[in-house]
Amino acid sequence: MYQLIDGFLDVVGIFFIVYLIGYSTFLFLSVVVGSIQLYRQHRQRRLQNYLPNDYHMPISIIVPAWNEAVTVVATVHSLLDLEYQAYEVIVVDDGSEDDTSQTLIEAFNMHAVHRPIWRQVPCQPEEFIYETRTQKVPFTVIRKKNGGKADALNMGINAANFPYFICMDADSVLQADSLKKIVQPMLEDRHVVAVGGLVRIANDVELEHGRVKKYRLPRNLLACMQVLEYDRSFLASRILFDQFNGSLIISGAFGLFRKDVVIAAGGYNVSTLGEDMELVVKLHEYCTVNRMDYCIRYATDAICWTQAPERLSDLKKQRRRWHLGLFQSMMKHRGIL
């Protein structure tokens, strides 16, 4: 009996040793490759500053919102002040129980419009549409029946006027030059179908007009630990996966997509918890099955700031949703693994 227990413990010990060696090697390679790529991008960015670039890809920014009346006006103000020339902002109110839509309508002096929305991907029907042309950037609010974040994003895709769209969270803030940065991979390579941005923790960071006024680590220990986690992931692991077109996720907080390819792939899946990851895996599958030359890229200098949970209960809910979404995506698209 004791020999069986000793044998089992030996196997477990060997497994953990192999796992630690493998994971440490992965982290080491991620840091090395990430450092090299960041240095190359820094040199390339210095060169681009001296080159004229007057072309701007037209982009639709889609912001799904549910019960965001407190923060949504500030979010929209920050989006309307981005350093970019050709874009529109679409806020999709997913059946909020508060005054999300009314707050926006009053704050931006919007008026009701009646225009058909072509359902290229399925979504719940709209209740009303408001627009404003008093801003320098076209701004639209769509109120629809509740169907979840993925359904709201599908509505935004259907309503978007431009061939490229960005999805982001209502509580996130894009850095002022983020659109200029995230379009670069698509301008450099016509085969790019999606680009992920760099998501950073905004807790205790002072932002003004899309720029960092004062940066400091969060006072909350849990949020501070997430800063290290995010930087390790976005500045190391994702750069490594980007080298061989292996990115399996673009954060729902900030990602750029080609609308025609997303529509052809079926849009966002409303039945999964991780709609952002499921879409990227689905794009890989769709492009592979249809023998398309494609790549999914990652822009390390296109920055989005987001709030991290500071309570353990909130972090638990977030990570549970992420891991269940990962499991659902892998099961649904296990054929490409």
Set out the residue ranges of the language-model regions.
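Cell-envelope/extracellular polymer assembly enzymes that use nucleotide-activated donors
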Residues: 57-60, 88, 263, 278
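N-terminal membrane-anchoring/stem segments of glycan-assembly enzymes
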Residues: 1-55, 238
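Acidic donor-binding segment of Leloir-type glycosyltransferases
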Residues: 77-142
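Long helical/loop segments within the catalytic core of UDP-sugar-dependent glycosyltransferases
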Residues: 113-140, 145-154, 158, 162, ...
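Short aromatic/hydrophobic "clamp" motif used to bind/position activated sugar donors
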Residues: 165
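A short, conserved alpha-helix in the catalytic core of glycosyltransferases
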Residues: 261-266, 272-298
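Basic/Trp-rich segment in TM-proximal cytosolic loops or flexible interdomain/linker regions
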Residues: 1-13, 17, 239, 244-246, ...
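N-terminal signal-anchor transmembrane helix
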Residues: 30-86, 102-105
